[in-house]
Amino acid sequence: MSDNTSTATQSTPLLQDTFTVGSRTFSSRLLVGTGKYKDMTETGAAIGASAAEIVTVAIRRTNIGQNSNEPNLLDVISPDKYTILPNTAGCFDAETAIRTCKLARELLGGHNLVKLEVLGDEKTLYPNVMETLKAAKVLIDDGFEVMVYTSDDPIVAQELESMGCVAIMPLGSLIGSGLGLLNRHTLSLIIENAKVPVLVDAGVGTASDAAIAMELGCDGVLMNSAIANAQNPVMMAQAMKHAVWAGRQAFLAGRMPMRKMATASSPQTGYFFQ
């Protein structure tokens, strides 16, 4: 997001460093998913440890009231405590994604904040940009606040923002790959140009990946596999919380310039012994 490129002053406490998505404002810049955990208990414990405020839910794969005979995720992740972010994971065309968002709005009593993802194929889970653009327009016209999963193409990101998407969510690398941020330069271009929040979505594997995303100037990071697939998900959730915080603080502080040659830390004059 372009207005985040200046460094913070000492009069800007990090505790007051919020960000706004559509009509909602948040303090935690870590967003988490709910899939791949071994059970509901682990899901709740890990999400609690992350201190996330936004929790994303795959409507086509997770019961949030569609089936009264199955455990309801909302019994563990309460909408009274978290902002539930329905997503369209598993959708491969605009029509299915639109229908899924409308179902989510019905199940959540008119909730209009959604995460749109329209996938290209099952092997890469790379975004289908054309179908994403098509779905985004319909949803925005229908009153949804759309956070959108997309490629790392700065031109596509600008188009989605121009359409009215409230957050741009470029992938760091393939969903669930844990490969980290393979595209830092293009991510930086998206961040510099954007006037809405930019959040890395997909590819984070460990805490350093999250910190790097925030150091680049991202407004937040969304992850699921990096926590759920860890040997200790609750501990990893805590690590990610601290990594996002540290990366954001480093960005606001302003890193030192990179130099090709050494620069001594101590003065080069006034030696005791010549």
Curated annotation (Swiss-Prot):
Catalytic activity reported: [ThiS sulfur-carrier protein]-C-terminal-Gly-aminoethanethioate + 2-iminoacetate + 1-deoxy-D-xylulose 5-phosphate = [ThiS sulfur-carrier protein]-C-terminal Gly-Gly + 2-[(2R,5Z)-2-carboxy-4-methylthiazol-5(2H)-ylidene]ethyl phosphate + 2 H2O + H(+)
CDD domains in the cross-refs: ThiG (cd04728)
Q: Name one GO biological process term.
A: thiamine diphosphate biosynthetic process
Q: Which GO terms describe its cellular component?
A: cytoplasm
Q: Which domain of life is it from?
A: Bacteria
Q: Which UniProt keywords apply?
A: Cytoplasm, Schiff base, Thiamine biosynthesis, Transferase
Gene3D superfamilies annotated for this entry?
Aldolase class I
The active site lies at: K115 (schiff-base intermediate with dxp)
Compartments where located: Cytoplasm
**Pathway per the UniProt entry:** Cofactor biosynthesis; thiamine diphosphate biosynthesis
The cross-references to Pfam families, in alphabetical order and at most eight, read: ThiG (PF05690)
**Its function?**
Catalyzes the rearrangement of 1-deoxy-D-xylulose 5-phosphate (DXP) to produce the thiazole phosphate moiety of thiamine. Sulfur is provided by the thiocarboxylate moiety of the carrier protein ThiS. In vitro, sulfur can be provided by H(2)S.
SUBUNIT field: Homotetramer. Forms heterodimers with either ThiH or ThiS.
- Protein name stated in the entry: Thiazole synthase
